[in-house]
Amino acid sequence: MAIKKLVPASHPILTKKAQAVIKFDDSLKRLLQDLEDTMYAQEAAGLCAPQINQSLQVAIIDMEMEGLLQLVNPKIISQSNETITDLEGSITLPDVYGEVTRSKMIVVESYDVNGNKVELTAHEDVARMILHIIDQMNGIPFTERADRILTDKEVEAYFIND
């Protein structure tokens, strides 16, 4: 549909909890398509509605081989005590990376574009992306969850050793 402009990191929409979707209609379908188009144009792994100035709990995640995950009003039902610490970043904060500890496995409840409830169990990288994007829709940037922010040299070393 359309590639949307990203809001800057200082935009107030990114500090507030996004509103729940109550109407599952064509405007939601357009928003999901706009998120997809914008995500791919930005070469991002995921994108949520507040990042394109829409205060709605709607997000999209590129799970590569598993396809595209659409999240509408997602809620974490359970998560493992076992955690993994890994590098995270955001297109909202370019060139900022941090080590974030997150649950290794989660169960998330969400809705599809038609308003049907779906439940998904996610592990490792996909679980991390879902937790990251839900935080973002709740006004919590990954930097608030980061154990530490990395220097440019540390980020380079991460990618060389990966």
UniProtKB/Swiss-Prot annotation:
InterPro entries: Peptide_deformylase, Peptide_deformylase_sf. One of its GO terms (biological process) is translation. Pfam families: Pep_deformylase. It comes from the Bacteria. Gene3D superfamilies: Peptide deformylase (3.90.45.10). GO terms for molecular function: peptide deformylase activity. HAMAP family: Pep_deformylase. Belongs to the polypeptide deformylase family. This is Peptide deformylase-like.
